[in-house]
Amino acid sequence: HWIIQGMLSLTDIRRIIQSGKPIVWTMHDMWPFTGICHYAGDCDKYATQCHNCPQLYKGSRKDIAYRTFQKKKKLFEGAQITFVACSRWLESLAKKSDLIKGQTITNIPNAINTNLFKPRDKKQAREKCHLPQDKKLLLFGSVKITDKRKGIDYLVSACKQIASSYPDFSKELGVVVFGNQAEQYASLFPFPIYPMNYVSNEKELVDIYNAVDLYVTPSLQDNLPNTIVEAMACGIPCIGFNVGGIPQMIDHLHNGYVAEYQSSKDLANGIHWALTEGEYESLSEEACRKAVSSYSESTIAKKYVEIYNKITGNHA
């Protein structure tokens, strides 16, 4: 995942390539096929040659993005690498990059433990999490709440629109937020907010998912968010923007709602629809079914075994 930051350098990767063995590289973001960035945003220079990087304070024609792109390109020449993206969206971006042209590029989603992440009693979950029993609860989570890419501002705006358009319905709502700096947004929501701060214990996370009614992820650019799969596995319908790998995970009006990109209004529509017009029990059952059938550890393991057998010539 994060192969740099003192874990694996380009020199280390070179040594692995020089072993002559076939390599399977799982991509969790765009770094393997860009100069230096993990998410390129609106920039598409990685398709041909990174330079004048918009993420650098002073990008230039031969900045560090340019130089690293060149190093990677030389590194990958002649290598036998199968790049596995975690979403069809990331796979499509990777195939545009000149950096890994000629390499095998495919996609396999992340796996989750569906024996742990599964539906549990909502009343008991709320008691454990000290959450009210009489509210319809929305959940938003991120390691860093203030990361603009995660889109919490759109959720705040959507909640304000709900409060304005559906005043009676809005009285039933509350927002559960997990992640660092959650308290900073408490005063911005028109509904009660219940900060959970940073959650590192998976069992506690399972309780939080089971305690809520909807998981809302207004992310502006994301690969295949584990939080969506985890919530779905617990039978929680999800709402998210039509971006990245999100529409691959959420089947619109079937197990959740895929909102128009960067539209707080449609995000609000999705929240209201799921909790008032949609058949909630059916949404919940389909969310759980999708998670188990598509993202269980056994399902994903079989897909990787197929790749390993193919690149090693073992077709048994």
Regions found by a protein language model. Name each.
Residues 34-39, 59-104, 112-116, 122:
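A short, active-site helix/loop in glycosyltransferases that binds the activated sugar's phosphate group
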Residues 220:
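Aromatic "clamp/platform" in nucleotide-sugar-dependent glycosyltransferases that forms part
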Residues 252-253, 257-264, 273-278:
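Conserved acidic donor-binding segment of nucleotide-sugar-dependent glycosyltransferases
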Residues 166-172, 177-206:
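Nucleotide-activated donor-binding/catalytic signature segment of Leloir-type glycosyltransferases, i.e.
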Residues 237-240:
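Short hydrophobic beta-strand element within catalytic cores of glycosyltransferases
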Residues 207-212, 304:
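Short alpha-helical donor nucleotide-sugar binding micro-motif in glycosyltransferases
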Residues 266, 279-294, 303-306:
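A short, well-ordered alpha-helix in the C-terminal region of glycosyltransferases
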Residues 131-150, 156-160:
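Conserved donor-binding/catalytic core segment of Leloir-type glycosyltransferases
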